Every structure is written in structure tokens, then in C-alpha cells.
Amino acid sequence: MAPELSSNWKKLQEKLKAPQPTKSAPISQEAAFKQAISKKSISSETLKRKAEESQQQQQASNPSKKPKRQKSQTQSQPSSQKPTEEKMGGNVQSKPTTSSSPNSTLPSLHLWADEQGISSESLAEAYNLGLRGTSSSSSSSHIPLLSTLPPAIPNAGLTLPGHSSSSPKSNKNGLPLPTDLPSSLTLSNGLTLDTSTTTDLALILQATKSNTLGKYLSIDCEMVGTGPSGATSVLARCSIVDFHGHQIYDSYVRPTAFVTDWRTHVSGISKRHMASARSFESVQATVAALLKGRILVGHDVKHDLEVLGFEHPHRDIRDTAKYSGFRKYGHGPKPSLRVLAKEVLGIEIHQGQHSSVEDARVAMLLFRKEKHGFDMENSNRYEEGQAKKGGNGGGGGGGKKKKGKK
């Protein structure tokens, strides 16, 4: 007879004989929430917190899906939408959207300058327009200034902005000439010009009144020879350009004496050009009116003024042949225009016959490149002269005060 097992062994055998429960697969967090809800094993506050955490996790995993309602966060609107509204302290405040266009058009600087009465020369000097570079060595950056200018028009006469030679009673836009112009124009050199005899003088006065011509003009003249050996020079062509190199005046001139040497190989002028040339008196009057009250630029200007038959105030002349900064380029007392063009501007001129328009443009370029030096030298020269005269009481109140202290 087998021994009887204790009660503890009997319990153990029953547990071993009983079927073992199978392990269930892990359920998801969402299924656990549902099971907990059905069994009411968690509170409503905990459920709400878990739901918000689950929603945030889903939003993080899918950023393209936007939440339906978010009171705690503010959304930014693009500038094209309507102004947003935000409640602060019970008041509704509008936030206007600002839209800025990076490509907004600014008013023209030249239009503004015209309204303020500022000349184009002063504008170009202030903004360093035109010439670039500070070295005196040759530079190709100066070449486009000449190449981009329109070609010279020989014997075109007066070519002011708005002037048309085919319509002497009106300008290019059909506007009538002003009727309040004086009948005569007295120049500083003593010449008295009758403005009723030529339309050019009336147009020049009109351009001066409207500040069309500007402050600076550059001149160059071509001469031919008269006398037994052709040594005496007389005027045969005169050209004038403005501060920007634009042609203002160009005319062939009928010589006042019999020509014995046309100097065609240099001047480019021959007898055939005289068929359409203007009289010396007409050219002299027009040029004198153009230069009145303006600063004259040129190379060795003394010879140009001699053949024109009038003078110009010395303090209003900027001569590239006499500028101290250019003396180092000359092999004598003064350098030639051809040497200055090559050494200072890096361009070649006078390869053949001369062009007075080109020479006037080169002289203006030389002046513009060293304008500050020209102005300083001119100011020092004539201020010193005034100071010496001021020693006798001509210096104004300062001279009188010194006299009283002695």
C-alpha cells in the first residue's frame, strides 16, 4: 500500500495537472486605453491627459497634418492675408501686415537734381560718375567714355538739347522761343551782340536761363595758314562740347584772309569745306555767347581765344597745358594733348588728321579726371591775389579792423 501524500503535495500536483494559460500578444497603447475605459480603471482626468499626449505624438510624427484647434499657440499669417486679431484683456487689437517690395522704384536722381536746381556736373562730381580709377597710368576704363559718345557731326552748328536747325522759330519740341529775351548781349570782353540777327543767340540765352548748357564747356579750334609762308594762323573750324562730352557746337569758318596753307594733313580742312562754312562774325558771336559766364576748358586755350578774337576771364579758364599735375609728362615747358591722352587716359589720338571735337572731348576728360586738383590750384592762385589786394583795405571788414588796431 503506497504511502499517503501530504496535503501540500496534493495541491502541487493539482497545479501541475491544470492547463497552463497561453501568453497573450502585447496590445497597443490605444487598445489598452479602450480596455481601461471599458473596465473604468482610470479616471477621466488621466484619460484626457493621455489623449492629449497621444495627439501630440501623432502631430509630431505627421507634421503635415495641422491640429483642428490650438488655443495656446498663435499662428503667423503671410503678408498677403488680412490683418490678424489677438484678444488681450478683453480688447481686440488688430495687427496690420506690412508688405515691402525689394524692387521698389526710386525717383530718378536726375529729376530730383533738376527740381533742386543742381547742375549735372555737380551731380556727376558728387557721385563720382563717369571717370573711374585714381591712378594716372593708362586704363581701359576711360575708353568707353569716348567710344560710347555719338560720333561728331561736322559743321552741324548749334546742337543744343531741344534745338532743331530746320525750325529756327521753335525748338525741337515745337515750343516757341521766349519773347522776353534782350535785344542785345554784352560780353565781358566788350563785344555787343545783336540777338535779333541770329536765332542761335536767342537759343543760347534760353538754354542759359534753363541751365541746359551746364557750367563747363570745352573748346578746340583748327587753324589754317595765311601770309607768305602760311605762318599766320586764322580760324577755320571751332568745336565745343559740354561736361559730358556731348557736342554743343561745331562749324567750319570762312577765313578772314587768303589761305596759303590749308594744313590739311593736320587740320583735316581743305578748300572744299568752305562751301558750307559760316562767316567768322557769326561763329565769333555764337561762341562768345556760349562761353559767357561759364568755365572754359581746353588745351593751350590762349591760341584758341586769339583766333576767335576775344578774351575770357582768366579765373574761369582750366587749361590742361598749364596744370601743374601734368607737367611731369612734358619734355618741355608743357606736354602735348596727344601725350596726356596716352599717359593719363590711356587712349591714342592724332593718328592722322586732327578732329577738333575729339580734342575738345579729350581735354574735358583730362579736366574731369583731375578736377579737384584743377579747382584747388585755381582757388589758391586767385585767392592769394585777392589777399594781396586786400592789404590796402580791399579785403572787407577784416582789413579795416586791422587798420584800427594799429
UniProtKB/Swiss-Prot annotation:
GO terms for biological process: RNA processing; rRNA processing. It is found in: Nucleus. Keywords: Exonuclease, Hydrolase, Nuclease, Nucleus, rRNA processing. CDD domains: REX4_like. Gene3D superfamilies: Ribonuclease H-like superfamily/Ribonuclease H. GO terms for cellular component: nucleus. Pfam families: RNase_T (PF00929). Residues 1-108, 156-181, 377-406 are annotated as: Disordered. Residues 54-64, 72-82, 94-108 have a biased composition (Low complexity). Residues 377-387 have a biased composition (Basic and acidic residues). Residues 388-398 have a biased composition (Gly residues). InterPro entries: Exonuclease_RNaseT/DNA_pol3, REX4_DEDDh_dom, REXO1/3/4-like, RNaseH-like_sf, RNaseH_sf. Residues 1-10, 162-173 have a biased composition (Polar residues). Its main location: nucleus. GO terms for molecular function: 3'-5' exonuclease activity; exonuclease activity; nucleic acid binding. Residues 216-367 form the Exonuclease domain. Its EC number is 3.1.-.-. Exoribonuclease involved in ribosome biosynthesis. Involved in the processing of ITS1, the internal transcribed spacer localized between the 18S and 5.8S rRNAs. Belongs to the REXO4 family. This is RNA exonuclease 4. It comes from Neurospora crassa (strain ATCC 24698 / 74-OR23-1A / CBS 708.71 / DSM 1257 / FGSC 987). The gene is rex-4.
